[in-house]
Design a protein with these regions (language model features):
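Conserved beta-strand segments of the P-loop GTPase G domain that flank and frequently precede/overlap
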Residues: 53-55
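Amphipathic alpha-helical "lid/sensor" segments that cap RecA-like P-loop NTPase cores
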Residues: 190-192
């Protein structure tokens, strides 16, 4: 994986004492923020008791994501009693139950990835559909949150500006990995 510096920055910012840590990856659309979040989650999955993915494109997508997270929690942690009693059709209740589970005193090692937070509620954003991410974070100040956004104005944690790849070898490494063509970085590629 290319972007080793960014991966190291994310890891350092999210490593801590059990209190909530938040990293915001911001940059142009298509620059690689989501792929960076995926790479971080894969690389550090053993550091977390659970990893959740929320699509923050709009409120409907977000609430559907919370329903999927609730089902994941019930599969992986069947003793989550509040979640087992929630009607999955009532998405506001599901969201509250997930936030309550995340806020349990012993539950400090989860990672929540908030992807596509591109319409944030800000003083400069007058869109009525804009989302306030803080409404969807647990009230307890614990766990890790990784946000991807196009907005450089989302200031809820450690900001990392994701830019285009500066080193052509990093670009070739990504191309090699995604195309399953070995050796692109050293000039030897198999023609398939």
């Amino acid at each position: 994986m290319a972007r080793e510096d960014e991966l190291r920055d994310i890891h350092e910012a999210l490593s801590g004492d059990g209190s909530r840590r938040t990293v915001v990856l911001h940059g142009l659309g298509g620059i690689g923020k989501t792929q960076l979040a995926v790479a971080y989650a894969k690389r550090h999955k053993d550091n977390y008791s659970a990893i959740f993915w929320l699509n923050m494109k709009d409120e409907d997508s977000l609430k559907q994501s919370f329903a999927k997270v609730a089902k994941q929690i019930l599969r992986e942690h069947p003793s989550a009693s509040r979640l087992s009693s929630v009607d999955m059709k009532h998405l506001d209740e599901v969201t509250d139950a997930v936030k309550a589970w995340q806020g349990l005193p012993y539950n400090t090692r989860w990672l929540m990835i908030c992807d596509n937070y591109d319409n944030p509620k800000l003083a400069t954003n007058k869109d009525i559909a804009a989302l306030d991410i803080t409404k969807y974070l647990p009230e307890a100040y614990q766990g890790s949150v990784l946000v991807t956004t196009r907005s450089s104005e989302v200031e809820i944690g450690h900001l990392i500006h994701v830019t285009k790849l500066g080193d052509v070898r990093d670009s070739l490494k990504i191309l090699s990995n995604t195309s399953y063509r070995e050796g692109l970085t050293d000039g030897k590629s198999s023609s398939t």
